[in-house]
Design a protein with these regions (language model features):
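Conserved ATP-binding subdomain of kinase catalytic cores across diverse folds
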Residues: 80-193
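Catalytic-loop of the protein kinase fold
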Residues: 225-228, 232
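Short alpha-helical segments that sit at the start of domains
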Residues: 1-17
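A short, conserved structural fragment
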Residues: 58-66
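Single conserved hydrophobic/aromatic residue that forms the stacking wall/gate
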Residues: 380-389
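ATP-dependent phospho-/nucleotidyl transfer catalytic cores
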Residues: 8, 51, 77, 133, ...
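Short amphipathic alpha-helical interface segments
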Residues: 12-31, 35, 39-40
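Short amphipathic alpha-helical interaction segments
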Residues: 42-54
Length: 389
């Protein structure tokens, strides 16, 4: 499911009211009957059909027919619109740009504020192509026995936002959390490269980066946390620039904010703005551009950093984080360490005999419990061990 904010400005307040009613009805109904939608939205039953028909055409809701009664269910598209509208009303998001990342459990978009500041919107989409036994592998539901994919996506976003806030407050290298609504998470834009895209690094920086990543794993563990998915897909690498370089870059106008508005035109609607391609472009040209973007997409580009550059890591993706008190904490810690070691061995032909172990780190933690963060109260620790490999 790809976010398309084109029709957000065309949806009327009554249609959003109906969409919200379907969402509220979904808490207790897998299929929400029409009369319940009318009751929750406080609209006339005769007008509900027309409003639902419009939402149905935009694929924001889906009609479900069964033997007992007919009704509607909310789609991920409708859930996206509700979240985007809420962020827009809070002035957190003004325009939506291109998709800059896609994963098994989420989609990443670049967005902008009314002042032109770039931000990153992460939309959780559990159950799309991610592992289907996620209800057992991740502690999203707590004591609940069952839940919909949308509800778990919302729990994942809330959990990640809480982790990001605590980590950012304690000085960990993570993006700045900005806002969160439903299954979406808004954070600061970091001018950095995904570690998986970097193919060449100076030897001194390879050692420096390896040491920084191992130190970050240890620092998290000393704070009572284990990332659980510490690999090249969840790590960004940022170039360290001095003030003179930053001034020269800003003087040239090479800022992230220009990336969102570099192509296309800005369309203004009812409380929302979307960046689209120019109207003069034909459909054939658009298709050709899409094909070219697939080949030269930033997601597939290889980055080479030459001599003289200095780098530092930024950690992302936190829904799967667990406490060091988790029954599988030692296995998860060792897996994080081995992911880094394996990547550096394959990508940079670099291998070090120096790496942390869970037992050694926990021994130092027992001597000084004051380093553990308050974030532990946010964690749900499984009562019994689970196979999380």
């Amino acid at each position: 499911m790809k976010l398309d904010a084109t029709d957000v400005r065309y949806i009327t307040p009554d249609e959003f009211r109906v969409l919200t009613a379907v969402e509220m009805g979904s808490k207790n109904h897998e299929v929400v009957p029409t009369h319940l939608i009318a009751q929750i939205s406080s609209l006339r039953h005769t007008g509900i059909s027309k409003l639902l028909s419009g939402l149905l055409k935009r694929r924001l809701v889906a009609r479900v027919r069964n033997n007992v009664y007919d009704g509607f269910r909310l789609t991920y598209g409708g859930y996206d619109y509700l979240a985007v509208r809420a962020l827009s009303k809070r002035k957190s998001v003004y325009g939506i740009g291109n998709q800059i990342g896609i994963g098994k459990e989420s989609d990443i978009y670049i967005v902008s504020t009314e002042e032109g500041e770039c931000r990153v919107l992460k939309i959780h989409r559990l159950g799309r192509i991610s592992f289907r036994n996620i209800k057992e592998k991740r502690d999203y539901m707590g004591k609940r026995k069952s839940a919909s994919w949308m509800y778990m996506s919302r729990l994942a976003a809330e959990k990640e936002y809480a982790f990001m806030q605590i980590l950012h407050q304690h000085g960990f290298p993570v993006p700045t959390p900005v806002d969160q609504n439903r299954h979406t998470l808004l954070m600061s834009y970091e001018d950095a490269y995904p570690l998986r895209q970097i193919s060449v690094l100076p030897l001194d920086q390879i050692r420096r980066l390896y040491s920084a990543l191992m130190a970050l794993i240890v620092r998290l563990a000393r704070a009572g946390l284990i990332h659980g998915d510490f690999n090249e897909f969840n790590l960004l690498v940022r170039e360290i620039r001095n003030e003179e370089e930053d001034d020269s870059v800003s003087a040239e106008g090479d800022t992230p904010a220009t990336d969102v508005r570099s192509e296309g035109v800005v369309e203004h609607g009812k409380g929302f703005t979307r960046i689209v391609k120019a109207d003069s472009a034909s459909e054939e040209e658009s298709e050709e551009e899409d094909e070219e973007e697939d080949d030269t997409s930033p997601l597939n580009q290889v980055v080479e950093l030459g001599e003289g550059v200095q780098v530092e890591p930024i950690l992302i993706d936190f829904p799967q984080m667990v406490s060091t008190d988790h029954p599988n904490a030692d296995m998860l810690f060792d897996r994080d360490v081995n992911c880094v070691r394996r990547f550096f061995r394959k990508r940079f032909r670099f291998e070090s005999e120096e790496f942390p172990t869970f037992a050694e780190v926990m021994e130092t933690v027992r001597r000084d419990e004051s380093e553990r963060l308050d974030v532990l109260c946010l964690l749900y620790t499984s009562p019994s061990p689970r196979d999380l490999s």
